[in-house]
Amino acid sequence: MLTWLNRNSLDFPPLEKALREPNGLLAAGGDLSADRLLNAYRHGCFPWFQDGQPILWWSPDPRTVLFPEELHVSRSLGKMLRQSRYHVTFDRDFASVIKACAAPRSYANETWITGSMQDAYLELHRRGHAHSVEVWDQNELVGGLYGLAMGQLFFGESMFSRADNASKVGFATLVQHLTDWGFVLIDCQMPTQHLHSFGARSIPRQTFADYLSRHLDQPSGADWSYRRV
């Protein structure tokens, strides 16, 4: 039976209560307050729903992750990185990145990044938890991604691209910096061919939960101040 969250409590049910079908549906309801979202990530779940649906919270089993040291950069992407066709910044324009990620795609008219979701993650950004990666072609924003950094873990949310391989350049650059900063895992949530091409793989939900318990409160060397890479 699906658990409905109490607005007066930030607690989530145990991960093992998640449904098998649809895979990982853990709870519904609640709200998108910053405190609830932070507690959700600490607990091992994330919101994902469409306009008109209640807020749905997910913790799939298995979980798709990327270990930074396992990043695979294709020959063509490596060449593009060396050529510095684009330049990359962190936290320069979070609002534009999440808005671009929310825009309808050619293969889907609807977006799960609703207006309320954008507002919620903008608040997390203001609090210093959510971060953006921007990819620029001169002064034009052509790609990027956003997610949360907690301890030694990064929780990826969404990416977009308006130019060839722009999001790939942004993601690869981010992973290289996360490696330097001592991050141990990037949560990719659900499997995609795009993520697998970077070396992402699936691990059991319990293994993912173990990483949370060991690394969420560990310090990292992250420096998200504006930079040009």
Curated annotation (Swiss-Prot):
Keywords, sorted A to Z: Acyltransferase, Cytoplasm, Transferase
InterPro entries given in the database record: Acyl_CoA_acyltransferase (IPR016181), Leu/Phe-tRNA_Trfase (IPR004616), Leu/Phe-tRNA_Trfase_C (IPR042203), Leu/Phe-tRNA_Trfase_N (IPR042221)
CC terms in the record's Gene Ontology section: cytoplasm
Superkingdom of origin organism: Bacteria
Gene Ontology biological process: protein catabolic process
Chief site of localization: cytoplasm
Subcellular localization: Cytoplasm
Catalytic activity: N-terminal L-lysyl-[protein] + L-leucyl-tRNA(Leu) = N-terminal L-leucyl-L-lysyl-[protein] + tRNA(Leu) + H(+); N-terminal L-arginyl-[protein] + L-leucyl-tRNA(Leu) = N-terminal L-leucyl-L-arginyl-[protein] + tRNA(Leu) + H(+); L-phenylalanyl-tRNA(Phe) + an N-terminal L-alpha-aminoacyl-[protein] = an N-terminal L-phenylalanyl-L-alpha-aminoacyl-[protein] + tRNA(Phe)
The keyword Acyltransferase belongs to this UniProt entry's keyword annotation: yes
Enzyme Commission identifier(s): 2.3.2.6
Nucleotide-binding recorded as keyword: no
Gene3D superfamilies linked to this entry: Leucyl/phenylalanyl-tRNA-protein transferase, C-terminal domain, Leucyl/phenylalanyl-tRNA-protein transferase, N-terminal domain
GO terms, molecular function: leucyl-tRNA--protein transferase activity
Protein family: Belongs to the L/F-transferase family.
Function of the molecule: Functions in the N-end rule pathway of protein degradation where it conjugates Leu, Phe and, less efficiently, Met from aminoacyl-tRNAs to the N-termini of proteins containing an N-terminal arginine or lysine.
Protein's name according to its UniProt entry: Leucyl/phenylalanyl-tRNA--protein transferase
Organism: Pseudomonas savastanoi pv. phaseolicola (strain 1448A / Race 6) (Pseudomonas syringae pv. phaseolicola (strain 1448A / Race 6))
